[in-house]
Amino acid sequence: MRLALLSCLALAACAGTPDTRPINLPLAATPSPKAEIDIAGDGDVIALALSGGGARAASFSLGVLQQLRDTKDSTGGRLIDRVALVTAVSGGAITAAWFGQHGPDGLDGLRAAALDKDWQSQLHTTWMSPQNWERLMQGGLNGPDKLSTWLDRQVFNGAKMRDLNARPRIVINATDLYSGAPFAFEAPWFDAICSDLDAVRLSDAVAASMAVPVAFRPIVVRTYGRECPHQLAPWVAAAETSRSAPMLLRETARSFRFFRDSERMDYIHLTDGGVADNFGVSSIVTLRAASGTPHGPFTARDAVKLKRFTFFIVNAERNAEGDWPKRESGPDGPQLVEALLGVSVNAPKRAAADAFAGEMEKWERDVIAWRCSLTPERAASLGAPENWNCSNVDFRLDIIAFGDLTDKRFADLGKAATAVSLPKETIDTLIAGGREAIARNPEVLALTR
């Protein structure tokens, strides 16, 4: 009896031990190729940033992609075929990863694979359970078995980062919990830690992007700086010491230096990408810097071909709600926590969007200056046609949001919970809202003409 009891206690202790195994392997060969954007067609290019927001964001962004797939330009081509880049966070990362794995024609399968499944009921959510107190003390109510493993088995079927289609480029964003800097599953980050990006499971990347603090335990990444055969790229030191570089770029560069400091760091603990930037646009600024060129991450040939670059931020932000603004006493405890969580995500996201607007303007200026510095011979070798106008390129930034819709639709979509699962009728409404927002957007309409 005593032996049986001890055995049960031992098993319980083992069962309660958190799984903190790193998701990555050391770099086996040469560093990852540069994170370049490959454009197609005649130089009219679309990029998308898909925000976080759980199943609300995943569903709304799915509607956006479906409508782009079903919208044709003046030549009969699909607008979605112009999409060269998708950067995404949390709920938006599920949709982006699915799109990168299955392409435009496989988008409809996301509902059965993920959105229509009741994942929420499988999670540990109650604060009343002593077992959950222990889980919380270990770093989060839910571990990899409730996030990475579920995504791998139910959604992505064992796919790895190498299995994503080359185009569009999919950028999945998390947050380095130690530095607070963005961490993207892209070549510059994995070169900095001397790790094999291609071997990372797609589910682990998405899980890192979705790992909301407290609700989910951080995803662990190992740094391999001690064994690294190459130095940090020159742009890292330049960005870290620059007085004019965007703050998030400087912090990202500083985090890269931490990755190589074995006295300071052996493991990176990744949490929800929305903690640093719920739009995922900050990583694009890093990719720009890491390219080492005025036009990067566009290739030189694509930068010459480029005519119009339209960047859509898809914002599935929840509406502010509650009756406490009518009360002199203000919010109660739970309402205060909910409001603080919303502010903590929305404030840095809005700051990142404003900073990115300035970066888009600079990107356009840099591309024009570089193009106009080319000799006619060099421009021709890169594919420039006769009578090519080096300054004829237009960069545009727009935000797709619930506020673009009717008041009724805005209210319905904005009250959807931030949860990993939602009722099917709510998903229907969110997908329809994403479609409607694209169908009536002026920048999208301009792309059809």
Task: List each language-model region with its residue ranges.
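Sec-dependent bacterial lipoprotein signal peptides
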Residues: 1-14
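Catalytic domains of lipid- and phosphate-ester/thioester hydrolases
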Residues: 13-449
